[in-house]
Amino acid sequence: MSYEVSCPSCGSAVIFAFDASIIRVCSSCRSLLVRDGARIENAGLVAELVSTPSLLLLGETGSYQGDSFQIVGRVQVEHPAGLWDEWRIAFSDGRLGWLAESLGRRHLLLDVDPGDLPAFSQCRPGERIRGRSAMMVIDVGVATVKTLEGELPQDLRPGETWNYADLAGPKGAFATIDFGDGEAARAMYLGRAATLEQLGLGHLGREAGFAKAAAKALQCPECRGALTLRLPDLSKRVACPYCGTLLAVEGSLQAIEAADKQNKLSFEPAFKLGAKARLDGVTWVVLGAMERSSGPSDYTRYSWREYLLHEPIRGFRWLVEDRGHWTVVDNAHAGDLEMGTKRRFGGQTFRHFVSSEARVDSLVGEFPWAVTRGEITQAADYIAPPLILSEESTATEFNLSLGRYIESADVAQAFGIAAPALPRKEGVHAAQPNPYQGRVGPLWLWFLALSAVLVVIFLFSATRSRTVFQTTVRLPPGAVSGSPQAVFISEPFQVTGSGNVRVKVYAPLDNSWLYLDGTLANTKAEAVGDFEMEAGFYRGADQDGAWSEGSGEAVAFLGGVPPGEYTLRLAPQWGVVGRSKRVLKDFQVEVRRGVPRASYLLIALVLIFLWPAWVTSRSSSFETARWSESDHAGS
């Protein structure tokens, strides 16, 4: 039930619209009115609201998961990372909640029983707390009330402070624990990230045309150079592009001071401040750029450049350049991170690549947090190309981001510039897709399939070969090696069909050898096929034991043999080695038509093996180059 009173300061009508409301800010004179039953106390004036790019308004109604709510109050809270708008909402069923806005992100949180929670000093960024689905601590600090508007169900005063811990849980869950000024939790708010559309407030963005505070022009107090603040309601640091001075911005530019006169720009940004880029179907504006590095000393540091992009509805993202390679980086929900030697996120497994201390060396443009030159964070990168998962932590914060590798040509197209204007690529990037990896598996499958086909063809051909002549050649008694008496000439035999002709000889050799000078002659034409064959088998023993080598078998292949009647002529020579007394008396001869040659099959297999082997080698070399830059080089 609403309750109307007159403002003790200006006399204007002030309405407490909700029974639970304790304080109300007079919209006319900004007096803070405290309600105690029917008595109204004037607690003094509160400061004017700091201009922010929020699209929300008091009295605006929306709905979440089917339940309607109304925005009844706002608290502007100073956090270490900047100013937050925290809107108090009242649901139609009597529940209360908060709609928190910071750096373009919104979280809807409901009041819940804090239950058994760890003490404030036990909440460490990057670690999970017991209970509450093992949510991860992502931010701890002290919050300060700057100013208020509307009505609130708790007695808050400007300047009031409290300890807090922000948590992230699975499936987008988010929570804030309020510890008051001590160690024990006094309140907890649980919910998740939400867009204007999910809150039933999508019309605000459309009606406002994504309105934001106009850019403001000012002068650098050091060099008097002209500066433009594109986000005057959010920016906390501005680095002069002319002299490098880092400026601290208080509120909405009521004061500017030189924060670091030594911030000399050590790199040439690839894009001008204010440049626009069309990425993923959205137009982003370059707000700032910084160079960061890691390494054991100033002489052995590894540097890269990060460009801060902004879009009024989607907030912020980074475009990172590292040795001519580019990644688009967005904030990721740390509550969905599965820890371990490897990381699991978004259904993907990420392998550890490198851990380091990342330091801010130089910067230009504006930033929505109090960045400083020399600022150091503990960083770790995990990769699943083309994705890279990055963790950065300090004593008070844990940030998770997900990057995606993009080609230089796509970056150039996004900014409408020529690709050669961008830094030239060097080496292999941690998240760069391996151009060969997707081809290795299919190529080996292709090799196995084709090999199987060739083997089947070979075996099928072998079963279709046939013997056209076979005999045992007996040497005449007393015949001398190489003499005309030892020459063998067969009876005529028919060779039909097509294909090659194989002549195969087997002799029972023992420390002896056999050489044959052969001729396959057509009896009705002058076509003659000449060939030579040699077999030898040797054995013995030495200090290493018994040994043997060679064989009593020899083969010769003849090609281009047309069908017809043929005779086989063999002129043998033979001999023994050492003290062998075995005398060669005979040998066997076989002539077959259409015998596939295993050597041809082997050559074919080697040739088709070369392509997948080369691609595999290139893929392996690419991965070797990638991991040579990691903490696991050589492992």
Say what each PLM segment does.
Residues 513-550:
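Surface-exposed beta-strand/loop patches in noncatalytic accessory domains
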Residues 488-494, 542-562:
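Beta-sandwich interaction modules
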